[in-house]
Every structure is written in structure tokens, then in C-alpha cells.
Swiss-Prot record:
UniProt similarity note: Belongs to the isocitrate lyase/PEP mutase superfamily. Isocitrate lyase family.
Keywords (A to Z) from UniProt: Glyoxylate bypass, Glyoxysome, Lyase, Magnesium, Metal-binding, Peroxisome, Tricarboxylic acid cycle
Protein name stated in the entry: Isocitrate lyase 2
UniProt: substrate binding residues: 86-88, 196-197, 232, 419-423, 454
Residue ranges of the motif Microbody targeting signal: 555-557
GO biological process terms held by the UniProt record: glyoxylate cycle; tricarboxylic acid cycle
GO molecular function: isocitrate lyase activity; metal ion binding
E.C. numbers: 4.1.3.1
Function: Involved in storage lipid mobilization during the growth of higher plant seedling.
Keyword Lyase belongs to the record: yes
NCBIfam families: isocit_lyase (TIGR01346)
Localization per Swiss-Prot or TrEMBL: Glyoxysome
CDD domains: ICL_PEPM
Source organism per UniProt: Glycine max (Soybean)
Amino acid sequence: EAEVAEVQAWWNSERFRLTKRPYTARDVVSLRGNLRQTYASNEMAKKLWCLLKNHQANGTASRTFGALDPVQVTQMAKHLDTIYVSGWQCSATHTTSNEPGPDLADYPYDTVPNKVEHLFFAQQYHDRKQREERMRMSREERARTPYVDYLRPIIADGDTGFGGTTATVKLCKLFVERGAAGIHIEDQSSVTKKCGHMAGKVLVAISEHINRLVAARLQFDVMGVETVLVARTDAEAANLIQSNIDTRDHQFILGVTNPNLKGKSLATLMQQGMAAGKSGAELQALEDEWLSKAQLKTLSEAVVEAIERQNIGEEEKRRKLNEWMHHSSYERCLSNEEGREIAEKLGVRNLFWDWDLPRTREGFYRFKGSVIASVVRGWAFSPHADVIWMETASPNVIECTQFSEGVRSKHPQMMLGYNLSPSFNWDASGMSDEQMRDFIPKIAKLGYVWQFITVGGLHSNALITSTFARDFANRGMLAYVERIQREERNNGVDTLAHQKWAGANYYDRYLKTVQGGVASTAAMGKGVTEEQFKESWTRPGAVEIDRGSIVVAKARM
């Protein structure tokens, strides 16, 4: 009973003031074991929450990008306050099966948690290394030496939760154990999951995604952690939905309005085509022809057209249209059955509108994606999530404004996230350089407190490797010295002395501590080539004594 009361008090804290749970504190305690455990990721989760709330209060944003490895994490820590771990990057570069591929979430489900652990271990290691180094300094030296907070909270890609409820629960457990401060889960079907900027995305019903979010929150509660939960929706550009079971989705599902197709479903037509030996382009032509005849519309669009065709006066027509728009406004989430009843009262009888006829061969319904559809999902997800993210097809401030105003009209304190995607051709967006520079702070004022370039690490890695490899092939070591070594020095990049960066001094401290303060085999002892980097250089170039120049690296002669 004491533990149940403790959990309830925790839920009553400011942290969870806006969070809705369909289960009780007793349910949570009953799922815990007798051995109470604590997790380092929980400290990072609390840090992340405070950081995001501060950004929300200040109208600013945490900006970050997907990190590939410990090198990127340590360099990002000097300038950015969060770290992102991208499923796309993991899929293409670091799956646990070592089989690369596109972002279809078909890699082993421990892939992203393992990358989180890889980076979290690196963060902790470089934090320990820095502390040991600073403890060897005098007070004056410490004051002169910038401190780097390597322990930046990690937010990781949870894709669709990787299956049913139990799969989501186990995935979330892995993330907590591996060091994630936050995760995001999207509302696509786990069977057909695609990168948010690919075609063919299939949504799940609103209620199914809520179940995923509840499963994640329950697992966090069982573990006693405050992991930040981000709910992503792909409803802005999706054109298919798995099910019509949730009435909140009905207003966005498309149906056939051409009565000539009654009883002639697309799926049956495609099956007949395949039976006749058609394939590829022929089947596509069949589908395209059928869809061109179908006159697909939402129920509301079909009713509006039917009212406009009625042989009545203009004033009466306007009255009926206004009444219909009142009843069918998107915030009411009118069901198909309710819509038909209201339409009949407005004189729309025997309306032909069939959402089953255009279903795909896989059984998916046609969906009309939009910002409004995303807003409706944002409303539904907000009580169960800490941050809401709408995936978009382009960097559009107007869409960002519509989504922000829509979601926050019902949930005014909701925090928002935004993908500053490299899948966008930013130069083709119509923005000037100044507008691109101001994009992050501009939408931050709309509540987008966490903004990230999902695949930023991969692109930066590819660019430097490609340009350096080409130059190195032509100019040899001069290319390395000019492009890398001198630039590391000019920009204060600590990998210039890579032995020190990797922690050779740190482990020398272990050796000397074990051996009473002296170790003849210390890695950074006499003879280490990194001594060459201890001098300060006035400029790069060959030694010219009469001009007072100093060599880039001390000669070994």
C-alpha cells in the first residue's frame, strides 16, 4: 500500500500534471518485482524535461541532429543541448544484423537501443575523462578551461513500437536500460512502416496508436522513470489507413461517389487482372483507370456537392450548407453513421458513397491526409504524450502555424517537435537564406521546442569523407594537413590530439594508481608522438628561423 501511495504521489507531481493514464497506481505496482532498480537514463530524462520546459517558457528550441558515433556526440556536446538517434541512420549504417537498408523499420528491434547504449557509454566515458583531467588542474587552470557538458539527453527513434503491445513494452524497456532520455513513436502501421518522407505510408487507427502510447507510459511507470514520450503523426501526407474502426478517422476516409462502379471494387478488379495474367504496368494501368472513374471524396465533400445540386433556392441552400458545416466541423469528429443521418435530414437521400470499393489489395482504406487530420490526431495523442510531432512534406511556416494553433486550441501547454528534414530540398522551398536562418527561432515561438535534422550526422559525415577523399587522392598529405589537421587546430577540435581525446591519459591514471603513482608502460609517457602538438604555432608552414615562423609539428631530427 505504501508503494501504491508513492506512485500516486509521483503522478500528482508537476511533471505529470497533463498526463492521462487509463490504469491505476495499483496496476503499476502489481507489475513490478521486489528488487527496486534505478536507471541512469532517468536522470537524463528529468534533465531533458526541464530543458524542454525552459525552452517552452522562453519561446526557444533545442536544436540537434542525428548522431552516428562517439566522435559526433562529443563534438555536438560543445554546442547542442540534446542528441538525436535516428532509426533511418541506424537502418542504413548500423543494424545489429549488420545488414544495411532503407528506413523500413525491418531491422532487428534492438538496433536503435544498441546505438543509444553505444553513444550513452561514450557520453559517460568522456564525462569521466574530463573530470579526471580537471582534477589534475589548479583552480586557475580550471577557471581558464571551458567545461563541456557531455551528458546531453538522448532522444531516440522508436519507429512504430515494433509490433503489438508486448513488443512496444519490451522496446521501451530496452531504451530505458540503454540510456534514452526520450523516445518517439509514430502512428504508421508496423507492417508497412516507411520513412516519413517516402510514399505508401499507412496509418493505424487513432485508438491503436493511443494503445502504443499507453503501453510505453505503462512500461516507464513500472520502471519508475520519467522518460519523455514523443507522439509522431504522419497524417499530413499519408494516403492510406489500416482500419475504419475509430470514428475520429471517418471524416478523412475517402469513398467512391460514381454509382456506375457500384459492386465493382478495385480489389476484385485487380484480382481478376492478375488471374488473366496481367502484371506490372498493366495492373497499374487498371488501377489508374478505375481510380480516375471513382470520383473519390470524403463523406463531407459528397454531402456538400449533393446539397449544391438540390433544386432549391439559394438562401435555403446556404442554410443547409451552413448547418452541415456546423455539424461536420472537424473538431466534432462526425462518424459515418451520424453524417448520413444528418445528411438525410437536410434532404440528401440515397447518397451513393462507398468507402469499401476503393480499398487496396491489402485491404487498406483511402485516406485524405492534411494538417487538419494531423491536428485531430494531435488532440487525441496529447493526453498520453509529452511532445507532439507532425511529419511534413516540406518546411512550411504556414503549416507549422496551423498545426500549432490547432493542437494548442485544446491543449495550450502542449510541447511540439519538428523534423528539419534533409529529405526537403531546402533550396527549392522558396525561402531566402535569411528565412532559412530564422526558420528554427520562428517556429520555436509557435511552441516547437525540439527541432532536429534526423539524418544530419550521416550527411555531414558523407560530405567531409567525399571531399577529403577526392582531395587526398590528388594532393596527398597536403590535403590532410590543410583540410583536417590545420582546421582542427584553428577550430579547437580536440581530436587533433586523438590519443588524449580517446582517453590515453585517463587510463594512464589507472596504471599509475594501481602501481603506486609510477608506470613505465604509461601510454602517454616519453616517446608518444602527440608531444609534437604541445607547442603553440604562430602559423602553419615550413620553418624559417629568420622570419620567426614555427613548424606545424616538431621535427624528429
